[in-house]
Each structure stands twice: as C-alpha cells, then as structure tokens.
C-alpha cells in the first residue's frame, strides 16, 4: 500500500460512513434514547411489563447501533488526522503503521454496516432452522449432517444457544431431518442468509469406486414469533399425526407416541417435533414452528411482489451456495459472488464473514 491507495481508502470509507449516517440518523437515535431514559424514570412505565420489555429491546438495539457508528466514525477521523500529521512531518513509521492497520479499519466499517443491516423488524429474534437432505440417500443424509454440525459450531462461536426440536437419524449415516431453535441476539438476522439449497461436490466416502458425487440439502430459516403475533390456522387446513420418537432421546424412545407431525395442506409445509417426552409440549412446539414457517412464507411472497420485475432469490427452493471438496476446494455463494478456499474452516462453523458478505450484497441490490 502507498499514500495514494491509503488516501483513496479513507475517501471510500468516509463516503460509506456518511451514507450510513444518512440512513440511521445518529442524532435521532440519541434523541430516542433520551426519550426512553425519561420513560424508564416514570414509575408507571414498569407496570406494563410487556411494553417495557419491547422498549428495552429497542433500547439495546439502537444503543449498539449508535456505539458501532461512533466507534467507526471516531476511528476513521483519528486515522485521517494522524495520516495528515504523519505526512506533514514525513513520519514514515507512523504511515506504515496506518497502512498495516488498514484492514482493521475496514473491518470496523463492515461491523457498522452489518449493525445497520441487522436492524430489521425480525432480525433480533431467535431463529428456527430446519435441514432436509435432498434425493441421494446416504450421501445426502451425510451432507445434511455436515451442515448441521457447521451451524452448531457457528452458534458456539457466536455464543448462541441451540435447542434441538426434531432429529431423525439416517439409516446408514447422517440424518434424515433436523430442526433446531437458535437463541441469541440477531440469530435470525444472521441465519436468514442460509435460506435455500446448499450443494456439495466431493469424492463420496460411501462409494467404493471413489467416484465424484453431488448432493443437495435445503435449509429453511424462520424467525421465532412472539406470542402476540396472530397467525390464523384453520383446523380444516391441517393434519396432525402422532408417532413414536426415534433417534437419541433416552429410555422413552419408541415407547410412547409423543412425537408430533403437522401438515399444512394449502402450503405443503410439514413440521414435526419430538424434543419432549410430553406429546402436549411437542404439539405446542410444532404449532409454533408452523406459524413461524407460514410467517416466513408470507414475508417471501411480499419480497417477490416488491421485486415483481425480477423474482426474488430469497427462497427455500433456490440454490444459494456450492461447497466443492473435489477436484479443488472452494465454497462459493451465488448471491455475493464471493469464493472462499478455507473449506475446512467453513465446515467447522467459520461462516460469519461469508454471511455478512451476503447481507451486504443483498442490501446493494435493493
């Protein structure tokens, strides 16, 4: 990097931060935080626990956004002033230190961008994730299991908590189906980028001839809905089946019909839950999963209508990413058009940067 390149980088980052400021309006955030502070000082505020909780979440979200903005704004100003001073004094060591720190400065601006992109209505919610292997038997089941592990490792890295709702093992390897709840700040905001078809190309460990195989698995992500959101489901539109739980689950497995499957006929959506010994609790969870899926489906329809000139790529049936393990190693996302060679790291849950690239690319297309 030289002086010209660094000057151009500062210009680009200042322009980006300026654009972000025009969108998030920091002064309005400060005014709203002051307003919330005054509300919290009123004794009557805490009498409505539900409303207090909603405002508390808003306060946390906009406080974090303002903090990220101020960190980025101050760091950029400091770097710019130091660069000008170092140039005027011909301080080559300081200039080189600024060059070396340039990637960190860029990361700070990206962090601000992501904070802005995760300020949507549902982004702060928990996420319900389901993984379904495509056709292909053992090979696809194993791929679904690899994706499941990838998301579990991602959740560990991000400090998200995971609760398994339904798990069905494959006959020889992998899994037939898994659904799980991810709890944490912006869980849905991040994981919504995983909605779609994931493609794997590799030499199959299950093929004695060592041939190359292509497998597919679909990932479906929906926000966990608050209880106050009304989703109407008519009895005539659903079929409820009860069956014995399978897979890991202790001594009660296969002894009682505690597992629940709900089929929503108009949409074709099927959800199932065998997480609990209680059929009643599993049924309640399955209904919650169904409501979240129907809500997500409605969001997708609205997205399609908003992009009527060009059908939206956000959907459960669209191939979003390819993971190639043979004859070369690469993970490529079709939405951001970014390619990554650290395949092992990605399959071990290092997917945050890839997800952030998708969120930024999708915002640029809006």
From Swiss-Prot:
It is found in: Cytoplasm. One of its GO terms (molecular function) is translation release factor activity, codon specific. Keywords: Cytoplasm, Methylation, Protein biosynthesis. GO terms for cellular component: cytoplasm. It comes from the Bacteria. Gene3D superfamilies: 3.30.160.20, 3.30.70.1660, Release factor. SUPFAM superfamilies: Release factor. The modification N5-methylglutamine is found at residue 251. Its main location: cytoplasm. Methylated by PrmC. Methylation increases the termination efficiency of RF2. InterPro entries: PCRF, Pep_chain_release_fac_I, Pep_chain_release_fac_I_sf, PrfB. NCBIfam families: prfB (TIGR00020). HAMAP family: Rel_fac_2 (MF_00094). Belongs to the prokaryotic/mitochondrial release factor family. This is Peptide chain release factor 2. The gene is prfB.
């Amino acid at each position: 990097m030289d002086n010209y390149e660094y000057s151009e980088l500062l210009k680009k980052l200042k322009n980006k931060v300026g654009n972000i400021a025009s969108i998030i309006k920091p002064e309005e955030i400060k005014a709203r935080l002051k307003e919330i502070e005054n509300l919290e000082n009123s004794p009557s505020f805490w009498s409505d626990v539900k409303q207090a909780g909603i405002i508390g979440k808003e306060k946390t979200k906009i406080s974090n956004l303002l903090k990220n903005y101020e960190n980025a704004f101050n760091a950029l100003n400091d770097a710019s002033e130091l660069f000008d001073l170092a140039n005027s004094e011909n301080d080559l060591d300081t200039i080189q230190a600024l060059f070396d720190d340039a990637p960190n400065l860029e990361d700070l601006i990206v962090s601000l961008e992501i904070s802005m992109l995760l300020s949507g209505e549902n982004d702060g919610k928990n996420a319900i994730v389901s993984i379904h292997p495509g056709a292909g038997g053992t090979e696809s089941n194993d791929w679904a299991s690899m994706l499941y592990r990838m998301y579990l490792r991602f959740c560990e890295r991000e400090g998200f908590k995971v609760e398994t709702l339904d798990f069905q093992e494959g006959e020889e390897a992998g899994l037939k189906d898994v659904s799980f709840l991810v709890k944490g700040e912006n869980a849905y905001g991040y994981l919504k980028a995983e909605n779609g078809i994931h493609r794997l190309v590799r030499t199959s460990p299950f093929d004695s001839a060592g041939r190359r195989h292509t497998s597919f698995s679909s990932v479906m992500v929906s926000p966990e809905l608050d209880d106050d959101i009304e989703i109407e489901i008519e009895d005539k539109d659903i079929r409820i089946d009860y069956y014995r739980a399978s897979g890991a689950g202790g001594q009660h497995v296969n002894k009682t019909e505690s597992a629940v499957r709900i089929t929503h006929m108009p949409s074709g959506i099927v959800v199932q839950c065998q997480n609990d010994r209680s059929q009643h609790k599993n049924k309640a969870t399955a209904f919650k999963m169904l409501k979240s899926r129907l809500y997500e489906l409605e969001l997708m329809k609205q997205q399609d209508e908003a992009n009527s000139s060009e059908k939206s790529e956000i959907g459960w049936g669209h191939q979003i990413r390819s993971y190639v393990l043979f004859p070369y190693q690469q993970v490529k996302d079709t939405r951001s058009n970014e390619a990554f060679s650290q395949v092992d790291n990605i399959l071990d849950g290092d997917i945050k940067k890839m997800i952030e690239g998708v969120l930024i690319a999708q915002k640029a297309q809006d």
